[in-house]
Curated annotation (Swiss-Prot):
Identification of the protein by name: Large ribosomal subunit protein uL2cz/uL2cy
PANTHER family: LARGE RIBOSOMAL SUBUNIT PROTEIN UL2M, RIBOSOMAL PROTEIN L2
GO CC annotation terms, alphabetical: chloroplast; mitochondrial large ribosomal subunit
Pfam family, one: Ribosomal_L2_C
UniProt gene name: rpl2-A
Main localization (coarse): plastid
Annotated region (Disordered), positions in chain: 1-26, 223-274
Gene3D superfamilies reported for this sequence: 2.30.30.30, Nucleic acid-binding proteins (2.40.50.140), Ribosomal protein L2, domain 3 (4.10.950.10)
Assembly notes: Part of the 50S ribosomal subunit.
Compartments, as annotated in UniProt: Plastid, Chloroplast
Family: Belongs to the universal ribosomal protein uL2 family.
UniProt xrefs under InterPro entries: NA-bd_OB-fold (IPR012340), Rib_uL2_dom2 (IPR014722), Ribosomal_uL2 (IPR002171), Ribosomal_uL2_bac/org-type (IPR005880), Ribosomal_uL2_C (IPR022669), Ribosomal_uL2_CS (IPR022671), Ribosomal_uL2_dom3 (IPR014726), Ribosomal_uL2_RNA-bd_dom (IPR022666)
UniProt keyword Transmembrane helix present: no
Length: 274
């Protein structure tokens, strides 16, 4: 992708970068509106994700995570921006007339052909079961349950690695560093998710961040005691506690939030790296 750097004509455009080749012109039959109750709250109105709210209205793009157009070749027609994820998406025209969106594999260009099935080439963008892949294959959009669609390694730049196959299971190393078992019958897509340099892009101004629905992050130590346990004091005072805490008084910075005795505990061979 071509990254365009704006000239320093105004403070808002100084060092701002955009991808000049990616457009946003979705097909009407592959989008639908969605009710945004957002702001990082759950059904009870409790904050579950901080610093969320506002942002531009979005139309949801229907992404084909299942890749169930078996043994039918498709051609990449467009590479588009998706406001609902940090990865780009591709519009695929299949030979039978079907049109679908998929995640954009890194290196794929307009005009490339892809296919999904059981005996397809090990080529970037092709989808096939893990049992038909050689060891060491880089993959993304990985199913956890067969037929449910890809659920792992879907973010921009994400890639997992097939490191072993034994019995009915395959061993994968996920982007987080976690090593876990998955059924060999589950499907995955060959290659890495595109838009690898998403973290190196510069938005240029605070307003661009607000368009994405991300609100400012305020440190607890500069708040009042009524707002945060770290708040209060004269000047730059210490937090007054042995360990940092959340605004609700729970331990912060590394507290484990995974449920105990989860069904998939016996499938995880090595926990993710911190």
């Amino acid at each position: 992708m071509a990254i365009h750097l704006y000239k320093t004509s105004t403070p808002s455009t100084r060092n701002r970068t955009v991808d000049s080749r990616v457009k946003s012109n979705p097909r009407n039959n592959l989008i639908y509106g969605q009710h945004r109750c957002g702001k990082g709250r759950n059904a009870r109105g409790i904050i579950t994700a901080g610093h969320r709210g506002g942002g531009h209205k979005r139309l949801y793009r229907k992404i084909d995570f299942r890749r169930n157009e078996k043994d039918i070749y498709g051609r990449i027609v467009t590479i588009e921006y998706d406001p609902n994820r940090n990865a780009y998406i591709c519009l695929i025209h299949y030979g039978d007339g079907e049109k679908r969106y998929i995640l954009h594999p890194r290196g794929a260009i307009i005009g490339d052909t892809i296919v999904s099935g059981t005996e397809v080439p090990i080529k970037m963008g092709n989808a096939l079961p893990l049992t038909d892949m050689p060891l060491g294959t880089a993959i993304h959009n990985i199913e956890i349950t067969r037929g449910r669609g890809g659920q792992l390694a879907r973010a921009a730049g994400a890639v997992a690695k097939l490191i072993a196959k034994e019995g009915k299971s395959a061993t994968l190393k996920l982007p987080s560093g976690e090593v876990r078992l998955i059924s060999k019958n589950c499907s995955a897509t060959v290659g890495q998710v595109g838009n690898v340099g998403v973290n190196q892009k510069s938005l240029g101004r605070a307003g661009s961040k607000r368009w994405l629905g991300k609100r400012p992050v305020v440190r607890g130590v500069v708040m009042n005691p009524v707002d945060h346990p770290h708040g209060g004091g004269e000047g730059r005072a210490p937090i007054g506690r042995k360990k940092p805490t959340t605004p609700w008084g729970y331990p912060a910075l590394g507290r484990r939030s995974r449920k105990r005795n989860k069904y998939s505990d016996n499938l995880i061979l090595r926990r993710r790296s911190k």
